[in-house]
Structure formats: structure tokens, C-alpha cells
């Protein structure tokens, strides 16, 4: 969320949408505070379900406005015909994780809304990565995917960019399966 809201914030700022820039950059700054405290050994802040839902609602609203402004307005910087695909790239971690987890739960005849440890961050932590390492892997992935999608938009159509993101989703699923199998193997061995 921090990278996505910061990206939207700077884009809104560069294009004169100051109210949305303020919302985006304030939210991004707030999330930096969460990261600061949650990576310390002594202090922790728990956002909870309500905080996560509000965060998701605000990011969804900012995403809709980002796409809308790219379709309907004149810009100080180049307009993004590929704004929907760039938004998907910015939000690929939660989108991919939700799709993967819902699919696995349904295939296992469980409610897609019942909590479990199938989320990718649980798989990384259960395989020996720290919370900090896992978080920075997700940050790096989000920055790399978004930057690459933004760069490739000059050379590829939106359809080709979608195929690129579907390929990344396939790799995400494969990685999740590998991590889940390693977790099962470790459980059996112990």
C-alpha cells in the first residue's frame, strides 16, 4: 500500500490533482509509521481488519481516480493509456495473493473467506524468512513489476502487458506451490 499510494500521490501532484495527492501522500506517510514501529523489536502497531478494509477502500478509490484522470484529462506529464495495467502492476501482490488463496480454498472445499496460512507472506515466514525480509521482498517485487510495466507500456499494447502480468501471476502461483511444499516437507520431517 505504501508504494502504491506514494506512486499515485506523486502522479496526482505532477498533474495538478492536489486533493488526491494529499490523500495519497498522507496515507503513504502513515503507512511508513506502521512499518517503522512494526520492524522494531519493542513496539508494534496492529492495523486490524477495520484498518485494512479502510486502507483497501482508499486505495481502490485512488486507483479508480488514477484511471479516470488518465482517460478524461489533459496532463502536465504524458497521459497513461495503460493506466489500468499500471494499476494492476502496482497492486499485483494483493491481487495475485487474493486470487491464489481463494482458488486454493475453493479447491479444498473450504470457504474462501475462512482464515488460514495460505497467504504468501505466511509461506515465506514459515520457510524461515523474517517478517522484515518478507516485507522487503514484496516491496522489491512491487517496485520492479510496476517499473517494468511502466517502461514496457511504450513498446507493448495493453493486451500484451496483460499477458505479461498473467505470466507473472503464473510465476507467483508456482512460487507459492514450492513454498507450500517446502513447508509440508519440513512439517513431515519434524
Task: Label each PLM-derived region with a short phrase.
Residues 1-127, 131-190:
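Alpha-helical transmembrane segments
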Amino acid at each position: 500500500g505504501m508504494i502504491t499510494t506514494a506512486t499515485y500521490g506523486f502522479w496526482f501532484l505532477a498533474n495538478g490533482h492536489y486533493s488526491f495527492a494529499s490523500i495519497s501522500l498522507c496515507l503513504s506517510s502513515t503507512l511508513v509509521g506502521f512499518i517503522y514501529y512494526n520492524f522494531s523489536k519493542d513496539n508494534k502497531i496492529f492495523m486490524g481488519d477495520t484498518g485494512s478494509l479502510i486502507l483497501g477502500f482508499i486505495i481502490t478509490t485512488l486507483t479508480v481516480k488514477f484511471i479516470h484522470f488518465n482517460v478524461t484529462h489533459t496532463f502536465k506529464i504524458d497521459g497513461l493509456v495503460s493506466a489500468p495495467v499500471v494499476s494492476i502492476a502496482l497492486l499485483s501482490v494483493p491481487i495475485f495473493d487474493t486470487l491464489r488463496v481463494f482458488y486454493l480454498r475453493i479447491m479444498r472445499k473450504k470457504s474462501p473467506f475462512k482464515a488460514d496460512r495460505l497467504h504468501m507472506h505466511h509461506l515465506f515466514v514459515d520457510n524461515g524468512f523474517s517478517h522484515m525480509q518478507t516485507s522487503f521482498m514484496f516491496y522489491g517485487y512491487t517496485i520492479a513489476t510496476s517499473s517494468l510495466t511502466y517502461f514496457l507500456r511504450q513498446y507493448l499494447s495493453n493486451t500484451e502487458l496483460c499477458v505479461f502480468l498473467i505470466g507473472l501471476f503464473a510465476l507467483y502461483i508456482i512460487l507459492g506451490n514450492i513454498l507450500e511444499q517446502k513447508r509440508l516437507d519440513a512439517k513431515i520431517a519434524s
